[in-house]
């Protein structure tokens, strides 16, 4: 089962990825994990990536694609994989097709967890944190016992800058602009499967399992 998982921040990708890899016995491969492993193992490409990251630069496609190819060639990917955070561009998607072809593999499904923007805003801007205990709450989904106060020590909860509406809105817009061409690309190729993320997480996963039980036409 060779899969790509897509979805905007707040769509619940992490939760669903964990369920998929546990049930199907395939590795969850995120770009960050790949970079960290390649740098830790001091592979040639890992060292190249490190030099760009240390300089505060974006890692060029050729290095990223090389690291992806190395990772997908490993033994644990023999029965499949779940890619998360790659590809991010059409050029990377086309390169991935070449990688899979060279490995005698092809994609089965591209899952896109779709959630209305206003719900993503609610999920992402509702987070509150205690600056003293580090405990995280959500004003809708996991509120403290006393509004605005930490359950543990009564400290005032704060909203991190990353969770403020203007920051979240900008992040969603950037992500949406980036992923729209990829969604169109995979839809045209018949790989795309839209998943309704505006449901409880178990229902979302039941929908994903139903999709994964189908054979691609």
From Swiss-Prot:
Purpose: Catalyzes the reversible transfer of the terminal phosphate group between ATP and AMP. Plays an important role in cellular energy homeostasis and in adenine nucleotide metabolism.
UniProt-listed HAMAP family: Adenylate_kinase_Adk
Signal peptide (UniProt feature, chain positions): none
Region (LID): 126-163
Gene that this sequence comes from: adk
Single biological process term from Gene Ontology: AMP salvage
Keywords tagged on the record: ATP-binding, Cytoplasm, Kinase, Nucleotide biosynthesis, Nucleotide-binding, Transferase
Top enzyme category: transferase
Compartment list: Cytoplasm
This protein's GO CC annotations: cytoplasm
Family affiliation: Belongs to the adenylate kinase family.
Domain comment in the entry: Consists of three domains, a large central CORE domain and two small peripheral domains, NMPbind and LID, which undergo movements during catalysis. The LID domain closes over the site of phosphoryl transfer upon ATP binding. Assembling and dissambling the active center during each catalytic cycle provides an effective means to prevent ATP hydrolysis.
The EC number(s) this enzyme carries: 2.7.4.3
Residues where AMP binds: 31, 36, 57-59, 85-88, 92, 160, 171
Region (NMP): 30-59
Pathway membership, UniProt: Purine metabolism; AMP biosynthesis via salvage pathway; AMP from ADP: step 1/1
Pfam family of the protein (one): ADK
Family matches, as InterPro entries: Adenyl_kin_sub, Adenylat/UMP-CMP_kin, Adenylat_kinase_CS, Adenylate_kinase_lid-dom, P-loop_NTPase
Protein name (record): Adenylate kinase
GO molecular function ontology, one term from the record: ATP binding
UniProt key word Nucleotide-binding: yes
Higher taxonomy: Bacteria, Bacillati, Bacillota, Bacilli, Bacillales
Positions annotated to bind ATP: 10-15, 127, 136-137, 199
